[in-house]
């Protein structure tokens, strides 16, 4: 597909927005889903100060801004800010005219229907898209891994979910959603670093902690054993330089933080961990297809990027499953972007072209068309 008529693929995550052209093998633009507004009164005339900043620009000016994420737990909570992010995506990042390209958007499974209708409405009415489609994130990740059957554990910044898929069909009764993801881990790391005497409180400082999490955290294979190693030696300690040059040291926080994926009680949450959620999801499926799901457990999303997570999942699910069951955890190296890559594959398939919702269909039926055409 040429860029001039190529479909746009926009994966709006709670934390990062990934955007690009169908047929490409990686997104052209990846930027934080943030809208920042100045905390202070502008005093310099002619500075060209704006009343809001989006993405990387908001990130770089974060010291003077209040940062807000318009998507929480995978659901858009602030549509005005969301529109700003889409505007920024089309005009500044991809530099395209949205009225000239079909656009494929993604959403979390089990999202409110109204969320999906509003997305459709904004695409057609604000951006005049010629055609659009909304796809479920986890299904796209499975496409990207080259499978049509498997269970996807998709964990991003705002929401995690397990989606069993058989021969290309998601099994909605067995989809489980867990509102525990990267942002909760960042918040938890902020909290346990405070116990060490480092205080991080503002929205800008949260971004520093997110960076510490991404660079230094890992999942322990055996949590108790790792805790005793950390207590008896300093071999697990790492240092991190803050933007002002101050150096902080972190030890057992490195694996205590992502451990909450497996033990949500650390965060004061009652839910089951990601391993048990995956198992429960498989158990909700027909007995005949479970074997295929165990053997094709695919990890996707940024929160599955912690070193050690695949081995730990293998260990935990093996402990839950029948003893003879073959269990395979697939952790593709590009899993941070596998939702986007799957979208790029889907939107460039010739068989997909009749699936688009056209502007004409929208004008005839209104926003509810999205439930009939996208599933």
From Swiss-Prot:
Name the SUPFAM superfamilies for this protein.
Actin-like ATPase domain
Please give the catalytic activity noted in the UniProt record: ATP + H2O = ADP + phosphate + H(+)
Which positions carry N-acetylglutamate? Answer: 2
PTM N-acetylmethionine: list the residues.
Answer: 1
As for subcellular location, the record says: Cytoplasm, Cytoskeleton
Q: Enzyme group, top EC level?
A: hydrolase
Keywords on this record? Acetylation, ATP-binding, Cytoplasm, Cytoskeleton, Hydrolase, Nucleotide-binding
Name of a matching Pfam family: Actin
Q: What is its EC number?
A: 3.6.4.-
Q: Which GO terms describe its cellular component?
A: cytoplasm; cytoskeleton
InterPro entries listed in its UniProt record: Actin, Actin/actin-like_CS, Actin_CS, ATPase_NBD
Provide the GO MF annotations for this entry. Answer: ATP binding; hydrolase activity
Role this protein plays = Actins are highly conserved proteins that are involved in various types of cell motility and are ubiquitously expressed in all eukaryotic cells.
Q: Can you tell me which family this protein belongs to? A: Belongs to the actin family.
Report what the protein is called.
Actin, cytoplasmic
Q: Which organism is it from?
A: Branchiostoma floridae (Florida lancelet)
Q: Source organism lineage?
A: Eukaryota, Metazoa, Chordata, Cephalochordata, Leptocardii
């Amino acid at each position: 597909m040429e860029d001039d008529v190529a479909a746009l693929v926009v994966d709006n995550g709670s934390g990062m927005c990934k955007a690009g052209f169908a047929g490409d093998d990686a997104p052209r633009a990846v930027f934080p889903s943030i809208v920042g507004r100045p905390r202070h009164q502008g005093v310099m005339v002619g500075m060209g100060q704006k009343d809001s900043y989006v993405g990387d620009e908001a990130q770089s000016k974060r010291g003077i801004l209040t940062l807000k994420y318009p998507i929480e737990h995978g659901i858009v909570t602030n549509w005005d800010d969301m529109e700003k992010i889409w505007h920024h995506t089309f005009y500044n990042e991809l530099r395209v005219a949205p009225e000239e390209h079909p656009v494929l958007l993604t959403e979390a499974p089990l999202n409110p229907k109204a969320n999906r209708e509003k997305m459709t409405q904004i695409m057609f009415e604000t951006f005049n898209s010629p055609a659009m489609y909304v796809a479920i994130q986890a299904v796209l990740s499975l496409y990207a891994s080259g499978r049509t059957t498997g269970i996807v554990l998709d964990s991003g910044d705002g929401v995690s979910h397990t989606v069993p898929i058989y021969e290309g069909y998601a099994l909605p009764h067995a989809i489980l959603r867990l509102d525990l993801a990267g942002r909760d881990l960042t918040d938890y790391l902020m909290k346990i670093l405070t116990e060490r005497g480092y205080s991080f409180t503002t929205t800008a400082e949260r971004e520093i902690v997110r960076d510490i999490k991404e660079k230094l955290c890992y999942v322990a294979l055996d949590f108790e054993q790792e805790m005793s190693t950390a207590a008896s030696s300093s071999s697990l300690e790492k240092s991190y330089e803050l933007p002002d040059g101050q150096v902080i040291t972190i030890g057992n926080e490195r694996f205590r933080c992502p451990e909450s994926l497996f033990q949500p009680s650390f965060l004061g949450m009652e839910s089951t961990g990601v391993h048990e959620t995956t198992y429960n999801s498989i158990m909700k499926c027909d007995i005949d297809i479970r074997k295929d799901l165990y053997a094709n457990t695919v990890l996707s999303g940024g929160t599955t990027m912690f070193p050690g997570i695949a081995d730990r999942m293998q260990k935990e699910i093996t402990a839950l499953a029948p003893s003879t069951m073959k269990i395979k955890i697939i952790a593709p190296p590009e899993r941070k972007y596998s939702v986007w890559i799957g979208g790029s594959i889907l939107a460039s398939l010739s068989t997909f072209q009749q699936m688009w919702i056209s502007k004409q269909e929208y004008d005839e039926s209104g926003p509810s068309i999205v439930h009939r055409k996208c599933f």
